[in-house]
Amino acid sequence: MAKRKLTQNQTRRIQSNNAKTLHRHKKKDIEWSDEMLGESQEGVVVTRYSIHADVENEQGEIYRCNLRRTLSSLVVGDKVVWRKGNEQLQGVSGVIEAIHPRENEISRPDYYDGLKPIAANIDRIIIVSAVLPTLSLNIIDRYLVVCEIAGITPLIVLNKVDLLAQEQRQEIEDQLKIYQDIGYEILMISAKSGENMEKLTALLAQGTAIFVGQSGVGKSSLINHILPSVNAQVGDVSETSGLGQHTTTSSRLYHLPQGGNLIDSPGIREFGLWHLDAEQITKGYREFQYVLGTCKFRDCKHLSDPGCALREAVEQGKISPVRYDSYHRLIESLSETKSQRHFSLV
């Protein structure tokens, strides 16, 4: 008799219980006492694994560390206080004891575990899009909402422009003008031909940046161009879905030769925003801010409501109708996703 196939929830519970068991086992095996540890020192998390993290000290040396049980979360980019062990235990060299307050963080929503932090202390988010299979302004808008809410400067990068004919390129430049008009910086590049790669490298030298974007847009190819020694695995775009295969398994922080840091994180196929409410989404559209609060009614939905200042600004040509429509599609998808998520948890 064939075994009954496990449901997705059952599979997740089994995996979760297995991970917790392994976690408890590891903690029992490695118990650090004060006598086994050196003085406290500063460090930065450069890679986070399930129960360990790689920490870089002020001299640029990297050590694999355990986490104190009191630490609730730890992500790449976190500035930490840690102690080096007098000797290695099972390949582990020390313990992370505290996390400094974060300047900012970006998170992605997890349908079962709530918000899952990805990285912290970021100066710039590089939103990577590609011309194939199609340019999605909706995906760009989702990332821009995240940037605005987190207070992190975005850079919109359009990769693989070498695949465009001149007429196609002009059409895409026209599409992207709505972002330039409201102050967003755009860079059209090609990791293959090298177009504008020097400009991207110069921008990356200004602090800590993170690449975000769907799989298959060329993030790994860009990293290989910027940091050839890293040799990030490149994934092909699926012919059926138009999406690339996930090629990065753990987020990691790299130091760039010209200065600055780059965080590479696993591709996110759908950057969900269901953890945000409509008011937060609205604040994620920077060009809306000067009219917010001036509508006739406080509960204005910015649709056909009488006296809607936002809609009037669109009609007067002060706000792009493309961005206005994108905003409402995002609000609608937010409601649909929340109801689906609620249903899946019942």
Curated annotation (Swiss-Prot):
Annotated region described as Disordered, given as residue ranges: 1-26
Coiled coil: none
Enzyme class (EC, first level): hydrolase
InterPro entries linked: G_CP_dom, NA-bd_OB-fold, P-loop_NTPase, Ribosome_biogen_GTPase_RsgA, RsgA_GTPase_dom
Annotated disulfide bonds: none
Cofactor: how bound: Binds 1 zinc ion per subunit.
PROSITE patterns named in the record: ENGC_GTPASE, G_CP
Binding sites annotated in the UniProt record for GTP: N159, K160, V161, D162, G213, Q214, S215, G216, V217, G218, K219, S220, S221
Keywords: Cytoplasm, GTP-binding, Hydrolase, Metal-binding, Nucleotide-binding, Ribosome biogenesis, RNA-binding, rRNA-binding, Zinc
Gene Ontology molecular function terms on file: GTP binding; GTPase activity; metal ion binding; rRNA binding
Cofactor: Zn(2+)
Biological processes annotated in GO: ribosomal small subunit biogenesis
Self-association and partners: Monomer. Associates with 30S ribosomal subunit, binds 16S rRNA.
Descriptive protein name: Small ribosomal subunit biogenesis GTPase RsgA
The organism's taxonomic lineage, starting at the top: Bacteria, Pseudomonadati, Pseudomonadota, Gammaproteobacteria, Pasteurellales
